[in-house]
Curated annotation (Swiss-Prot):
Catalytic activity as recorded in UniProt: 5-oxopentanoate + NADP(+) + H2O = glutarate + NADPH + 2 H(+)
EC category: oxidoreductase
Protein name: Glutarate-semialdehyde dehydrogenase
Positions annotated as active site in the UniProt record: E255, C289
Amino acid sequence: MQLKDAKLFRQQAYVDGAWVDADNGQTIKVNNPATGEIIGSVPKMGAAETRRAIEAADKALPAWRALTAKERANKLRRWFDLMIENQDDLARLMTIEQGKPLAEAKGEIAYAASFLEWFGEEAKRIYGDTIPGHQPDKRIIVIKQPIGVTAAITPWNFPSAMITRKAGPALAAGCTMVLKPASQTPYSALALAELAERAGIPKGVFSVVTGSAGEVGGELTSNPIVRKLTFTGSTEIGRQLMAECAQDIKKVSLELGGNAPFIVFDDADLDAAVEGALISKYRNNGQTCVCANRLYVQDGVYDAFVDKLKAAVAKLNIGNGLEAGVTTGPLIDAKAVAKVEEHIADAVSKGAKVVSGGKPHALGGTFFEPTILVDVPKNALVSKDETFGPLAPVFRFKDEAEVIAMSNDTEFGLASYFYARDLARVFRVAEQLEYGMVGINTGLISNEVAPFGGIKASGLGREGSKYGIEDYLEIKYLCLGGI
């Protein structure tokens, strides 16, 4: 691992301020999806080690929450500064373990760091209220306090940003956190722990436990010390975690699956729409929860849009993310490849046509050609199921009512996108789409200042923005009598 700072490549878990192995010495191997090579290994921890991390978080909680907001903010700011100072190393580490191109990885590091900066400042803006009393001698005050020990389970597709988007508000609010990162991408998480330690985050405040998803996750959901769980991942696992957390009424934040529609109306700027589709669909090789999963294009511009999209996709450069000029890396594993192939085969069997890509890339491994399907029928599997890969199925629609009905015909409600110029239509469609987020004439909507989250089966709660810190706070009502 060639890094400027070799200490950022950690192969031990970080628990209670110490770098430790699993009790039984077992490890999990981590591979580079672009080459298949083994990068290294991390501890395969279980319930016992997780319990110790939780107990350490509980022990660290009183002192951490007692700090002033400014003191916590200063430590988060230092963590942010260290991420920016080490952006190149962190990005390289991410590309090696996750596969995304280096330019995308650098962008993610900047995005990830922004949550530490933002929520460090928000720590100073945790405001309460005074409410007129219900009797002459009564005074009512509302204060907000940290919920306590929190747990986070994060995915492999954004292995840094999904951590800071949770740890930032948790620590800013005065909570402590135990993190279980994805086993495919643990090194990004461990590098962040190294920088947190350098930033002066006290021991026990932020721990990273690597290992068995079932055992670690089971302890996080069943341990009564943990008062909140935050999870980004599939709806299936989210349902399971929510049920487990219900046993002792834990607070939960869930950012789950998506099935984003990307709508292009007749009056759209087609060049802008193609640019937006390229970003929304093929960024991170389609492995994002907010990527366009269904492209709906109105009859009048259907053929022109497809031609422009084909030309844009043809310019994508597939390869190892560390190589110069590469725009698209590999899929994370063979299972991801199989799902893309399944969706293509199903659509083609029902009448769709492949006009670009459609098969594994000549590079082999988990590389896959960016694919476009046309004349996709409404009953295709891809219309209901999130692909999580470089497949753009282009559906036709006739009018606004039809496309809104098709777009909303899903259990998911995370992100949606549409391109149109008519101002009345912009507001009409935006308000009728049943999604937590709507991108209008843009294919890139994620940032630290906006509330990220979904409705329906896409989750609960919001991350980022001034609302993101609220999920880590409890409201307490004080009634003063005899005044």
